[in-house]
Amino acid sequence: MPEITVRAKSKTYPVYINEFALDDVRGKWTESLAKYSHVFVLTDGHVAELHKSKLDEILTDLPVVTYYVAPNGEEAKTFRVYEDVMTKMIESGLDRKAVLIAFGGGVIGDLGGFVASTYMRGIPFYQVPTTVLAHDSAVGGKVAINHPLGKNMIGNFYQPEAVIYDTQFFATLPEREMRSGFAEMIKHALISDYTLLRALMDTFTEPKDFYTKDLTPFLQRGIEIKANIVAQDETEQGVRAYLNFGHTFGHALEAYGNFSKWLHGEAITYGMIYALTMSETIYGLDFNLAEFKTWLRNLGYDTTFDVTVPFSNILENMRHDKKTTFNEISMVLLKEIGKPVIFKAEDELIFETYKRVMRNGEDAF
């Protein structure tokens, strides 16, 4: 089974990835879990309905297991749900020798990691992601909840004990969720390797390919790219910011849509094309953007806006981005594919780029 080692400054841990990862690690994982006083599983309603029985089968011999089922989607990453999870943990008698399992997509991983990092000043946790999107968020230790004014504004850096990534769960993902997660795979290729991007474009040409082609080697490569960056810069003081390519504009768009209008990967896709457009302006990026947009459309990504998104809202949300310092908005741009750079963008440039990609319902991207 493919195994990747993440060597962050604070912790070294494995990422297990294949179609039957849970079965493959079951013996040694349950042996490790048995050492804890209490196992607390955080999941959401959708995952619980489809896959709880699989986890039950593995945890059946453990003496104390408690589940908390959070709301589906970004609604789970709120103060209200965070407090409710904490209340459940306290009422269930979890002590500092307890362990948390985040069983779900990126939202559950973010929430679960933040809960684990703050409960009694920190308890261990495991990431058991169930979505394509979570191949990015489950690795690297960035955990957070949202604030109404910005995404992931309240958070921490807190590494898991391990990531157990069982790709059999993908079979139940809706196409829209698959596409959302695939956007992060595209991001990893854009910031690291044109050859990887070309392989993605040649392998995945229509939506059904998400289910019929093998995602695992591409997911593994994306995780390796991220693990290498995290090893250099765990707390995002430098190169780790490159992983935010497309996220400055994308997060601003998510906030404008109240974290419900667009899925994360959908917003990030718009954000990546916004950043590619700005990269053409600033660095003369040599990249066939027209071919790239056509490929996205063939995969089912929406490349038009049917609503007017006010620039004032986007700009204000971009100012709340975590990379913004001294009121200067930092963008991750590309000098060329695989060569990202941090660029401090002035409002005029942000607006000019905005006008190029947001044409009030025309083919914005």
From Swiss-Prot:
Gene Ontology CC annotations of this record: cytoplasm
Gene3D superfamilies cross-referenced by the UniProt entry: 3.40.50.1970, Dehydroquinate synthase-like - alpha domain
Enzyme class, first EC level, given as a word: lyase
Residues at which Zn(2+) binds: 184, 247, 264
Free-text comment on the cofactor: Binds 1 divalent metal cation per subunit. Can use either Co(2+) or Zn(2+).
Keyword list, A-Z: Amino-acid biosynthesis, Aromatic amino acid biosynthesis, Cobalt, Cytoplasm, Lyase, Metal-binding, NAD, Nucleotide-binding, Zinc
Catalysed reaction, written as an equation: 7-phospho-2-dehydro-3-deoxy-D-arabino-heptonate = 3-dehydroquinate + phosphate
Cofactor: Co(2+); Zn(2+); NAD(+)
Cellular compartment(s): Cytoplasm
SUPFAM superfamilies linked to this entry: Dehydroquinate synthase-like
InterPro entries according to UniProt: Dehydroquinate_synthase, DHQ_synth_AroB, DHQ_synth_fam, DHQS/DOIS_N, DHQS_C
GO molecular function: 3-dehydroquinate synthase activity; metal ion binding; nucleotide binding
Pathway: Metabolic intermediate biosynthesis; chorismate biosynthesis; chorismate from D-erythrose 4-phosphate and phosphoenolpyruvate: step 2/7
Keyword Cytoplasm: yes
Chain residues that bind NAD(+): 106-110, 130-131, 142, 151, 169-172
EC number: 4.2.3.4
GO biological process entries: amino acid biosynthetic process; aromatic amino acid family biosynthetic process; chorismate biosynthetic process
HAMAP family in the cross-refs: DHQ_synthase
Family indicated by similarity: Belongs to the sugar phosphate cyclases superfamily. Dehydroquinate synthase family.
Biological function: Catalyzes the conversion of 3-deoxy-D-arabino-heptulosonate 7-phosphate (DAHP) to dehydroquinate (DHQ).
Protein name: 3-dehydroquinate synthase
Organism of this sequence: Listeria welshimeri serovar 6b (strain ATCC 35897 / DSM 20650 / CCUG 15529 / CIP 8149 / NCTC 11857 / SLCC 5334 / V8)
Gene name as annotated: aroB
